[in-house]
């Protein structure tokens, strides 16, 4: 799986900075080593369920450590992942599934149930995912016209009908390398995250992971809920 450059970004971060904080959230601090281990465990669960290279899988969740693990675990299987906001209405989710021809969808139960099928319950260290395959044949390859696809995201649709954009592993890494030449983020930096991860994963969350910056995930946007101790650690 040497071609899975996006997954390697997390794996390499765990090797370089195993005890450095990757995520601050309402459950405490999660190190890069812990984030990678939980992602690996979820990846193997998905592989055992039948997720594999050539598939498209949606991950619908709120801003959370599990959303990050979910995105990377799908990519680690060799599949293409679509980050989906948990705030979408059922009709909007139905449109996405129909337009994107995803093979499966996994969600954290914080939004509508995305698919009317029997789902597999996948426990995480905190909370859980539910997973189900769609009616798309597993033999139908997803984004066959793109070399080494990693992400699919839909445009906002403000200038017309939403369109799916495929981003390859190579393109995703090139984007964040270019962005960080300006941002200069690295180990010891912490980004307080308030925007929807589903719409900003590639050039934000992936960038922070690759360069060792911690992500402080807020439950809401109120400054009073973001506190920092004398050591610079965030507690929400």
Q: For the regions a protein language model found, what residue spans apply to each?
A:
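Structural motif
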Residues: 60-62, 86-87, 106-110, 125, ...
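ANL superfamily adenylate-forming
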Residues: 107-147, 161
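A short helix-loop-beta submotif of the ANL/AMP-binding
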Residues: 55-56, 62-82, 86-90, 99-103, ...
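Conserved AMP-binding/adenylate-forming core of the ANL superfamily
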Residues: 2, 6, 11, 19-50, ...
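Conserved pre-ATP/AMP-binding loop-to-beta segment of ANL
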Residues: 3, 19, 136-154, 161, ...
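Solvent-exposed alpha-helix faces
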Residues: 40-44, 160, 177-180
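Conserved helix-loop-beta element of the AMP-binding
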Residues: 101-103, 117-129, 172, 190-192, ...
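Conserved AMP-binding/adenylation subdomain of ANL enzymes
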Residues: 173-190, 197-236
